[in-house]
């Protein structure tokens, strides 16, 4: 386990373990976090000011193909945390990290799996019954079942300015370039978090 909570607190002073977090909640009733937002009319990744990852312009390098075989690298959790902080901003969101270290996979490996073996994007969108959070939770399950130890989870975020909406997608750490990408499970697009337009609320890995 690469992550020591005392060392982590030196980098991120607001770090809590689960017991410390639960101790700060009300003792006589649960703390309920409820989604009270409207979902966007189209996935936010399709906005003009969003940087999509272009796999045609960035083909899989030969070095990444070589890394697809053999033992995978073990990534310290602090690397993932620092990459998330760099991508989303320094704070004002909750980040739940369940593991002290992760197994390193690349964006090209994940894209190959999603493109060839996953069909979450073909599911029908049904308000309330199967909407954005359901899409992201289903894809998270499929990906984590296939790529053991992958730093792949779910993020909830919304706009910094009106009109207000909220959205849930997947979040992924690509170890080959030490970078965070969001993954829209409704259309399989990989994109960067737009810190100028959006604010993160919660991330769960």
What are these regions (language model features)?
Residues 2-205:
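A structural boundary/capping signal
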